[in-house]
Amino acid sequence: MPMYILHAKDRPGVLQRRLSFYAAHRAFLEEQDEAGPVRVIMSGPLQTDDGETMTGSLLLLEAPDRAAVDRFVAEDPFTHEKIWGEVSISRFHRRPRPRKDTPER
């Protein structure tokens, strides 16, 4: 199944709103991961360089197609509550990295 990277930057001045809707956003991700069709492989907040402030979100998603990802984004509480500003979605091809302890063939 195709994979997608979702990179979302928060709008300026929304940190307190982000914090108030963070639990709803997390619940949405868990619900979607269980119900499908979009599976959340990895997710987490983007942060300032000092690690003190959340500034956006990064998600690695598995989905049947781009349309499913677009619906996923449209339904996320961070979209409804206008927390995310700029959102980019890119299809991603995972290339396994060989482990150092694996003998070459």
Model-derived segments and spans:
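Conserved, structured core segments of small domains
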Residues: 1-105
